[in-house]
Structures are given as C-alpha cells and as structure tokens.
A protein has these predicted regions:
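Active-site rim helix/loop that mediates acceptor-substrate recognition in acyltransferases
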Residues: 1-26
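Short hydrophobic/aromatic beta-strand element in the GNAT-like acyltransferase core
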Residues: 7, 18-22, 32, 53, ...
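A conserved beta-turn-beta hairpin within the catalytic core of GNAT-like acetyltransferases
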Residues: 38-54, 61, 80-82, 115-117
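Conserved acetyl-CoA-binding loop-helix of GNAT-fold acetyltransferases
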Residues: 56, 62-75
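Conserved GNAT acetyl-CoA-binding A-motif
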Residues: 77-90
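Conserved catalytic-core motifs of GNAT/GCN5-like acyltransferases
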Residues: 87-89, 99, 104-120
Length: 129
C-alpha cells in the first residue's frame, strides 16, 4: 500500500511456475497473492516457493480473505511434490496472519526500505502419500 505501481512488477512474475491468484467478490477483485520458485536464504538445500505480493482491498480486510488466499496458494504449491518449504518476508503488522496460518518466524525482524520492518516466516510442507 502506498507504493508506486511499478513496484507491483516482481522478478519471476513471468516464470511459468509462478502462481498468481485472486479473490473476487461479485466479480470485483478484492485480494491477490503470488508464489514463485525462489530458494529460502535459510533453507537453501530445499526446493522452496516464496509468497509475495499479498494484498487485500481495505474494505474486505478482517474477513479471512488473506487466509483463504494463503490456503489456496499452499494447496497449489503442495501439488508440486518436490517443493518442501514456503517462505515469505512479512510486514511485522501482518505477523499474526502468518502465525494463524501455520508459518513459523525465523530470525529477528529486519528493515526493507522504504516499506518498513519485516519478519521472515517459513512453513514446511507435508506431502500426503
């Protein structure tokens, strides 16, 4: 929020393995999330996906839209049987959302300028046999 439109374009957006999901209400886009293959700096030996570009329209926050997007993207990533971990850098204000969705914090908070204080989170995927 509050960033220039160009900041919405991310490296690997066009990668064929990258996932872009949206949440809609009455045909209106109310939330987005992306997940892309990207090694986690803390678990470089595992094939990982990074969650990025999570956003929910302010009028729809607090309605579990973000959790539904996270679960939808996790379900799709789990289908890629070689992916072991999903990770992200969360704004610290959003930390409760990721804790609620089974992610674990790693390390200490760090600054991403000009956005603010962030915390890295990781979730180990358990593939059903």
């Amino acid at each position: 929020e509050g960033q220039p439109l160009e900041s919405c374009v991310l490296e690997k957006d066009e990668d064929p393995q990258t996932l872009h999901l949206g949440a809609f209400f009455n045909s209106k886009l109310i939330g987005i999330i992306s997940a892309m293959p990207n090694p986690c700096p803390d678990f470089t030996k595992h094939r990982s996906f990074q969650l990025r570009a999570m956003a929910v329209h302010p009028e729809y926050r607090g309605m579990k839209v973000a959790s539904q997007l996270i679960q939808a993207v996790l379900n799709q990533v789990k289908e890629k049987s070689t992916v072991k971990t999903v990770w992200l850098n969360s704004r610290v204000l959003a930390n409760p959302l990721y804790l609620k969705n089974g992610f674990e914090p790693i390390g200490t908070p760090f600054e991403i300028k000009p956005i603010g204080l962030h915390q890295r989170f990781i979730k180990q995927l358990h593939h059903e046999i």
